[in-house]
């Protein structure tokens, strides 16, 4: 497809200004960097996993990266283009708490049925533990992915139906900051645990 232009087209820039929290200058800079790392203008899951591994050098980030990739890939075509990338980045880095929680919910809801089952939560938590357990000391009641999943469900599943709705997820996270920490996977926040 030839060499990509390193400047965003005006209509794309307008669209991204309306749909992200980034300035025009920031968008142009991100685009330049994106094309430098992805000359084709798209990222596949393997390329994404390699990039993600740089952020978590002491653990295995590949499974978690697959879940993040799936959530970034909003049109489910198996690739992430710049628009998908920058919109997800905007939500995760600059979005309001509720936007971040909605994004996280969509990542945890593996089958897309509008609920997070214990199995889905456990799969994500296992991926998080593989990625950060070597650099994070967990309290006893969160020492395994299973214990952490149970703790999250005890606090969030208010109607005890064995699954979390978006409302339960957001309400639980907003009412107790420790739940947000339970859901996070940032090793720099290890001291919070």
UniProtKB/Swiss-Prot annotation:
SMART domains: EFh
Domain remarks in the Swiss-Prot or TrEMBL record: Binds 3 calcium via EF-hand domains. The cryptic EF-hand 1 does not bind calcium.
Binding positions for Ca(2+) 2 per the UniProt entry: 109, 111, 113, 115, 120
Residue positions binding Ca(2+) 3: 157, 159, 161, 163, 168
Location of this chain's protein in the cell: Cytoplasm, Cytosol; Membrane
Cited function: Calcium-binding protein that may play a role in the regulation of voltage-dependent calcium channels. May also play a role in cyclic-nucleotide-mediated signaling through the regulation of adenylate and guanylate cyclases.
Result after altering residue 71 to N: In DYT2; no effect on protein localization; no effect on protein abundance; no effect on protein stability; no effect on protein 3D structure; decreased oligomerization; changed calcium-binding; effect on cooperativity for calcium-binding; no effect on affinity for calcium; no effect on interaction with voltage-dependent calcium channels
CDD domains the UniProt entry points to: EFh
Annotated Pfam families: EF-hand_1 (PF00036), EF-hand_7 (PF13499)
UniProt KW keywords: Calcium, Cytoplasm, Disease variant, Dystonia, Lipoprotein, Membrane, Metal-binding, Myristate, Repeat
Name of this protein: Neuron-specific calcium-binding protein hippocalcin
């Amino acid at each position: 497809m030839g060499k990509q232009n390193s400047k965003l087209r005006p209509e794309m820039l307008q669209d991204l200004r309306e749909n992200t929290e980034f300035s025009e200058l920031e968008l142009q800079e991100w685009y330049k960097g994106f094309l430098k790392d992805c000359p084709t203008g798209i990222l596949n899951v393997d390329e994404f996993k390699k990039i993600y591994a740089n952020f978590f050098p002491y653990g295995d980030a590949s499974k978690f990266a697959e879940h993040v990739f799936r959530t970034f890939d909003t049109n489910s075509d198996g690739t992430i283009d710049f628009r998908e990338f920058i919109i997800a980045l905007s939500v995760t880095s600059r979005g309001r708490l509720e936007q971040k929680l909605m994004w996280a919910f969509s990542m945890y809801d593996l089958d897309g049925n509008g609920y997070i089952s214990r199995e889905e939560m456990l799969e994500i938590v296992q991926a998080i533990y593989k990625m950060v357990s070597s650099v994070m000391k967990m309290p006893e009641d969160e020492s395994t992915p299973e214990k952490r999943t149970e703790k999250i469900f005890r606090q969030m599943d208010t109607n005890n139906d064995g699954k979390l709705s978006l409302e339960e997820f957001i309400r639980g996270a907003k009412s107790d900051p420790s739940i947000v920490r339970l859901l996070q996977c940032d090793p720099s926040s290890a001291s919070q645990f």
